[in-house]
Amino acid sequence: MIFSTLEHILTHISFSIVSIVITIHLITFLVDEIVKLYDSSEKGIIVTFFCITGLLVTRWISSGHFPLSDLYESLIFLSWSFSLIHIIPYFKKNVLILSKITGPSAILTQGFATSGILTEIHQSGILVPALQSEWLIMHVSMMILGYAALLCGSLLSVALLVITFRKNRKLFYKSNGFLNESFFLGENVVENTSFFCAKNYYRSQLIQQLDYWSYRVISLGFTFLTIGILSGAVWANEAWGSYWNWDPKETWAFITWIVFAIYLHTRTNRNLRGPNSAIVASIGFLIIWICYFGVNLLGIGLHSYGSFPSTFN
Protein backbone atom coordinates (compact mmCIF):
# COMPACT_ATOMS: atom_id res chain seq x y z
CA MET A 1 0.00 0.00 0.00
CA ILE A 2 2.84 2.37 0.90
CA PHE A 3 4.68 1.66 -2.36
CA SER A 4 1.48 2.06 -4.36
CA THR A 5 0.83 5.45 -2.75
CA LEU A 6 4.45 6.54 -3.29
CA GLU A 7 4.29 5.45 -6.93
CA HIS A 8 1.05 7.41 -7.36
CA ILE A 9 2.63 10.53 -5.83
CA LEU A 10 5.79 10.29 -7.95
CA THR A 11 3.69 9.81 -11.10
CA HIS A 12 1.67 12.96 -10.40
CA ILE A 13 4.77 14.97 -9.44
CA SER A 14 6.60 13.97 -12.62
CA PHE A 15 3.55 14.74 -14.78
CA SER A 16 3.12 18.14 -13.08
CA ILE A 17 6.78 19.02 -13.61
CA VAL A 18 6.58 17.85 -17.23
CA SER A 19 3.53 20.08 -17.81
CA ILE A 20 5.37 23.08 -16.36
CA VAL A 21 8.52 22.33 -18.39
CA ILE A 22 6.48 22.03 -21.61
CA THR A 23 4.95 25.45 -20.90
CA ILE A 24 8.40 26.95 -20.25
CA HIS A 25 9.76 25.40 -23.46
CA LEU A 26 6.92 26.94 -25.46
CA ILE A 27 7.57 30.36 -23.90
CA THR A 28 11.33 30.19 -24.53
CA PHE A 29 10.64 29.03 -28.10
CA LEU A 30 8.58 32.17 -28.71
CA VAL A 31 10.82 34.52 -26.71
CA ASP A 32 14.49 33.57 -27.01
CA GLU A 33 15.69 36.31 -24.68
CA ILE A 34 14.33 34.69 -21.52
CA VAL A 35 17.46 32.80 -20.41
CA LYS A 36 16.35 32.19 -16.81
CA LEU A 37 13.24 30.35 -17.97
CA TYR A 38 15.38 28.05 -20.13
CA ASP A 39 17.61 27.24 -17.13
CA SER A 40 14.50 26.50 -15.09
CA SER A 41 13.25 24.06 -17.72
CA GLU A 42 16.62 22.29 -17.74
CA LYS A 43 16.53 21.90 -13.95
CA GLY A 44 12.94 20.71 -14.24
CA ILE A 45 14.04 17.87 -16.52
CA ILE A 46 16.72 16.88 -13.98
CA VAL A 47 14.11 16.82 -11.19
CA THR A 48 11.87 14.73 -13.47
CA PHE A 49 14.76 12.29 -13.98
CA PHE A 50 15.04 11.68 -10.25
CA CYS A 51 11.25 11.33 -9.97
CA ILE A 52 11.26 8.74 -12.76
CA THR A 53 14.16 6.93 -11.08
CA GLY A 54 12.20 6.84 -7.82
CA LEU A 55 9.12 5.65 -9.70
CA LEU A 56 11.03 2.78 -11.33
CA VAL A 57 12.68 1.72 -8.06
CA THR A 58 9.35 1.87 -6.19
CA ARG A 59 7.61 -0.17 -8.88
CA TRP A 60 10.50 -2.68 -8.86
CA ILE A 61 10.24 -3.19 -5.08
CA SER A 62 6.44 -3.40 -5.02
CA SER A 63 6.16 -5.81 -7.98
CA GLY A 64 9.21 -7.91 -7.20
CA HIS A 65 10.53 -7.72 -10.76
CA PHE A 66 12.32 -5.17 -12.93
CA PRO A 67 9.69 -2.75 -14.31
CA LEU A 68 9.94 -3.59 -18.01
CA SER A 69 7.07 -6.04 -18.47
CA ASP A 70 4.53 -3.93 -20.39
CA LEU A 71 4.14 -0.87 -22.60
CA TYR A 72 3.61 1.57 -19.71
CA GLU A 73 6.76 0.47 -17.91
CA SER A 74 8.81 0.50 -21.11
CA LEU A 75 7.61 4.06 -21.83
CA ILE A 76 8.68 5.14 -18.35
CA PHE A 77 12.07 3.53 -18.90
CA LEU A 78 12.33 5.15 -22.35
CA SER A 79 11.66 8.54 -20.76
CA TRP A 80 14.28 7.75 -18.10
CA SER A 81 16.77 6.88 -20.88
CA PHE A 82 16.08 10.17 -22.69
CA SER A 83 16.57 12.05 -19.40
CA LEU A 84 19.84 10.21 -18.72
CA ILE A 85 21.18 11.08 -22.19
CA HIS A 86 20.03 14.67 -21.58
CA ILE A 87 21.79 15.09 -18.22
CA ILE A 88 25.26 14.20 -19.54
CA PRO A 89 25.53 17.05 -22.10
CA TYR A 90 23.78 19.44 -19.69
CA PHE A 91 26.58 19.15 -17.12
CA LYS A 92 29.29 19.22 -19.79
CA LYS A 93 27.90 22.55 -21.08
CA ASN A 94 29.64 22.10 -24.44
CA VAL A 95 27.11 19.70 -25.92
CA LEU A 96 24.01 21.89 -25.63
CA ILE A 97 23.00 20.95 -29.16
CA LEU A 98 22.28 17.39 -27.96
CA SER A 99 20.22 18.58 -25.00
CA LYS A 100 17.96 20.47 -27.42
CA ILE A 101 16.87 17.07 -28.74
CA THR A 102 16.90 14.91 -25.61
CA GLY A 103 14.99 17.43 -23.46
CA PRO A 104 11.77 17.59 -25.51
CA SER A 105 11.98 13.82 -26.16
CA ALA A 106 12.03 13.05 -22.43
CA ILE A 107 9.26 15.56 -21.75
CA LEU A 108 6.88 14.24 -24.41
CA THR A 109 7.50 10.56 -23.61
CA GLN A 110 7.00 11.03 -19.87
CA GLY A 111 3.96 13.23 -20.48
CA PHE A 112 2.34 10.55 -22.64
CA ALA A 113 3.17 7.72 -20.22
CA THR A 114 1.77 9.51 -17.14
CA SER A 115 -1.11 11.38 -18.79
CA GLY A 116 -3.68 8.70 -17.98
CA ILE A 117 -4.06 7.38 -21.54
CA LEU A 118 -2.50 4.08 -20.48
CA THR A 119 -4.40 3.91 -17.17
CA GLU A 120 -5.43 0.28 -17.69
CA ILE A 121 -1.86 -0.99 -17.54
CA HIS A 122 -0.55 1.31 -14.80
CA GLN A 123 -1.00 -1.43 -12.21
CA SER A 124 1.85 -3.90 -12.11
CA GLY A 125 0.79 -7.54 -12.42
CA ILE A 126 2.34 -10.98 -12.24
CA LEU A 127 4.87 -11.67 -14.96
CA VAL A 128 3.89 -14.09 -17.71
CA PRO A 129 6.04 -17.26 -17.62
CA ALA A 130 8.10 -16.16 -20.65
CA LEU A 131 9.23 -13.03 -18.80
CA GLN A 132 10.21 -14.75 -15.56
CA SER A 133 13.90 -14.79 -16.37
CA GLU A 134 17.10 -13.01 -15.44
CA TRP A 135 17.41 -12.04 -19.11
CA LEU A 136 14.55 -9.55 -18.71
CA ILE A 137 16.81 -6.80 -17.36
CA MET A 138 19.60 -7.42 -19.86
CA HIS A 139 17.51 -7.76 -23.02
CA VAL A 140 14.76 -5.17 -22.56
CA SER A 141 16.92 -2.49 -20.91
CA MET A 142 19.50 -2.72 -23.72
CA MET A 143 16.75 -2.50 -26.36
CA ILE A 144 15.11 0.56 -24.75
CA LEU A 145 18.45 2.30 -24.21
CA GLY A 146 19.26 1.54 -27.84
CA TYR A 147 15.93 2.98 -29.01
CA ALA A 148 16.48 6.13 -26.95
CA ALA A 149 19.99 6.77 -28.27
CA LEU A 150 19.03 5.94 -31.87
CA LEU A 151 15.98 8.22 -31.71
CA CYS A 152 18.09 11.11 -30.37
CA GLY A 153 20.79 10.57 -32.98
CA SER A 154 18.19 10.31 -35.75
CA LEU A 155 16.54 13.56 -34.65
CA LEU A 156 19.93 15.26 -34.88
CA SER A 157 20.18 13.94 -38.44
CA VAL A 158 16.70 15.26 -39.23
CA ALA A 159 17.78 18.67 -37.90
CA LEU A 160 20.89 18.45 -40.09
CA LEU A 161 18.76 17.81 -43.18
CA VAL A 162 16.42 20.71 -42.40
CA ILE A 163 19.28 23.18 -41.88
CA THR A 164 21.13 21.92 -44.97
CA PHE A 165 18.01 22.27 -47.10
CA ARG A 166 17.37 25.80 -45.84
CA LYS A 167 21.03 26.71 -46.31
CA ASN A 168 21.07 25.48 -49.92
CA ARG A 169 17.80 27.24 -50.69
CA LYS A 170 19.08 30.53 -49.26
CA LEU A 171 22.35 30.11 -51.15
CA PHE A 172 20.37 29.86 -54.38
CA TYR A 173 18.23 32.93 -53.65
CA LYS A 174 21.17 34.94 -52.31
CA SER A 175 23.33 34.21 -55.34
CA ASN A 176 20.57 35.42 -57.63
CA GLY A 177 20.01 38.43 -55.39
CA PHE A 178 23.69 39.40 -55.48
CA LEU A 179 23.73 39.21 -59.26
CA ASN A 180 20.76 41.56 -59.51
CA GLU A 181 22.04 43.85 -56.78
CA SER A 182 25.48 44.22 -58.33
CA PHE A 183 23.95 46.02 -61.31
CA PHE A 184 22.31 48.70 -59.15
CA LEU A 185 24.05 48.89 -55.73
CA GLY A 186 27.64 47.87 -56.35
CA GLU A 187 28.98 49.54 -53.19
CA ASN A 188 26.74 47.46 -50.89
CA VAL A 189 27.65 44.10 -52.35
CA VAL A 190 30.88 43.69 -50.34
CA GLU A 191 29.13 44.50 -47.05
CA ASN A 192 26.22 42.16 -47.77
CA THR A 193 28.58 39.43 -48.91
CA SER A 194 30.62 39.58 -45.68
CA PHE A 195 27.44 39.37 -43.59
CA PHE A 196 26.19 36.47 -45.67
CA CYS A 197 29.53 34.64 -45.35
CA ALA A 198 29.54 35.04 -41.56
CA LYS A 199 26.02 33.66 -41.32
CA ASN A 200 26.87 30.85 -43.70
CA TYR A 201 29.96 29.98 -41.62
CA TYR A 202 27.82 29.68 -38.47
CA ARG A 203 25.41 27.35 -40.28
CA SER A 204 28.30 25.24 -41.55
CA GLN A 205 29.66 24.88 -38.01
CA LEU A 206 26.20 23.91 -36.75
CA ILE A 207 25.85 21.28 -39.49
CA GLN A 208 29.25 19.83 -38.57
CA GLN A 209 28.27 19.60 -34.90
CA LEU A 210 24.97 17.92 -35.77
CA ASP A 211 26.78 15.43 -37.99
CA TYR A 212 29.43 14.78 -35.33
CA TRP A 213 27.01 14.12 -32.47
CA SER A 214 24.43 12.23 -34.50
CA TYR A 215 27.14 9.77 -35.54
CA ARG A 216 28.37 9.25 -31.99
CA VAL A 217 24.94 8.93 -30.41
CA ILE A 218 23.75 6.54 -33.14
CA SER A 219 26.94 4.47 -32.72
CA LEU A 220 26.18 4.17 -29.00
CA GLY A 221 22.56 3.26 -29.70
CA PHE A 222 23.59 0.69 -32.32
CA THR A 223 25.84 -0.98 -29.74
CA PHE A 224 22.98 -1.18 -27.23
CA LEU A 225 20.62 -2.48 -29.93
CA THR A 226 23.09 -5.19 -30.97
CA ILE A 227 23.56 -6.34 -27.37
CA GLY A 228 19.78 -6.30 -26.89
CA ILE A 229 19.12 -8.43 -29.99
CA LEU A 230 21.85 -10.95 -29.13
CA SER A 231 20.71 -11.30 -25.50
CA GLY A 232 17.13 -11.61 -26.73
CA ALA A 233 18.15 -14.45 -29.05
CA VAL A 234 19.77 -16.33 -26.16
CA TRP A 235 16.70 -15.73 -23.99
CA ALA A 236 14.39 -16.89 -26.80
CA ASN A 237 16.33 -20.13 -27.10
CA GLU A 238 15.88 -20.76 -23.37
CA ALA A 239 12.18 -19.82 -23.34
CA TRP A 240 10.92 -21.08 -26.72
CA GLY A 241 13.66 -23.43 -27.93
CA SER A 242 14.71 -21.29 -30.89
CA TYR A 243 17.10 -18.37 -31.25
CA TRP A 244 14.96 -16.63 -33.87
CA ASN A 245 11.25 -16.99 -34.70
CA TRP A 246 10.63 -14.10 -37.14
CA ASP A 247 8.09 -12.68 -34.73
CA PRO A 248 6.82 -9.21 -35.92
CA LYS A 249 8.84 -7.51 -33.17
CA GLU A 250 11.96 -9.51 -33.99
CA THR A 251 11.57 -8.83 -37.70
CA TRP A 252 11.27 -5.07 -37.24
CA ALA A 253 14.13 -5.03 -34.73
CA PHE A 254 16.24 -6.75 -37.38
CA ILE A 255 15.13 -4.20 -40.00
CA THR A 256 16.07 -1.41 -37.56
CA TRP A 257 19.49 -2.98 -37.06
CA ILE A 258 20.02 -3.27 -40.84
CA VAL A 259 19.05 0.38 -41.45
CA PHE A 260 21.49 1.73 -38.87
CA ALA A 261 24.19 -0.70 -40.01
CA ILE A 262 23.79 0.88 -43.46
CA TYR A 263 24.05 4.32 -41.80
CA LEU A 264 27.32 3.38 -40.09
CA HIS A 265 28.61 1.91 -43.35
CA THR A 266 27.91 5.20 -45.18
CA ARG A 267 30.01 6.96 -42.56
CA THR A 268 33.09 5.06 -43.75
CA ASN A 269 32.84 6.84 -47.12
CA ARG A 270 33.67 10.56 -46.95
CA ASN A 271 31.48 11.30 -49.96
CA LEU A 272 28.41 9.82 -48.25
CA ARG A 273 28.79 11.65 -44.92
CA GLY A 274 26.57 14.56 -43.95
CA PRO A 275 23.18 14.81 -45.71
CA ASN A 276 23.45 11.40 -47.41
CA SER A 277 23.97 9.45 -44.19
CA ALA A 278 21.45 11.72 -42.43
CA ILE A 279 18.76 10.56 -44.88
CA VAL A 280 19.39 6.95 -43.82
CA ALA A 281 19.20 7.93 -40.13
CA SER A 282 15.94 9.80 -40.77
CA ILE A 283 14.46 6.65 -42.30
CA GLY A 284 15.69 4.78 -39.23
CA PHE A 285 13.77 7.22 -37.01
CA LEU A 286 10.49 6.09 -38.59
CA ILE A 287 11.50 2.42 -38.50
CA ILE A 288 12.17 2.59 -34.74
CA TRP A 289 8.68 3.92 -34.01
CA ILE A 290 7.16 1.20 -36.19
CA CYS A 291 9.19 -1.39 -34.28
CA TYR A 292 8.43 0.05 -30.84
CA PHE A 293 4.85 1.33 -31.21
CA GLY A 294 3.45 0.14 -34.54
CA VAL A 295 3.99 -3.57 -33.88
CA ASN A 296 2.29 -3.19 -30.49
CA LEU A 297 -0.89 -2.08 -32.25
CA LEU A 298 -1.12 -5.53 -33.84
CA GLY A 299 -1.12 -7.30 -30.47
CA ILE A 300 0.11 -10.54 -32.06
CA GLY A 301 3.26 -12.62 -31.89
CA LEU A 302 5.52 -13.73 -29.08
CA HIS A 303 5.90 -10.13 -27.87
CA SER A 304 2.15 -9.44 -27.60
CA TYR A 305 2.45 -8.92 -23.82
CA GLY A 306 3.93 -5.52 -24.64
CA SER A 307 0.92 -4.41 -26.68
CA PHE A 308 -1.70 -1.76 -26.02
CA PRO A 309 -4.62 -2.63 -23.74
CA SER A 310 -7.74 -4.09 -25.32
CA THR A 311 -9.55 -0.74 -25.39
CA PHE A 312 -7.06 0.51 -27.98
CA ASN A 313 -7.40 -2.50 -30.26
Curated annotation (Swiss-Prot):
Keywords (A to Z) from UniProt: Chloroplast, Cytochrome c-type biogenesis, Membrane, Plastid, Thylakoid, Transmembrane, Transmembrane helix
Membrane topology: Multi-pass membrane protein
Record GO terms (molecular function): heme binding
GO cellular component: chloroplast thylakoid membrane; plasma membrane
TM ranges: 9-29, 44-64, 71-91, 111-131, 143-163, 217-237, 244-264, 278-298
InterPro entries listed in its UniProt record: Cyt_c_assembly, Cyt_c_biogenesis_CcsA, Cyt_c_biogenesis_CcsA/CcmC
Pfam families, alphabetized: Cytochrom_C_asm
Main location (coarse class): plastid
GO biological process, one term: cytochrome complex assembly
Protein localization: Plastid, Chloroplast thylakoid membrane
UniProt family annotation: Belongs to the CcmF/CycK/Ccl1/NrfE/CcsA family.
Reported function: Required during biogenesis of c-type cytochromes (cytochrome c6 and cytochrome f) at the step of heme attachment.
Subunit record text: May interact with Ccs1.
Record-linked NCBIfam families: cytochr_II_ccsB (TIGR03144)
Protein name, UniProt field: Cytochrome c biogenesis protein CcsA
Biological source species: Solanum bulbocastanum
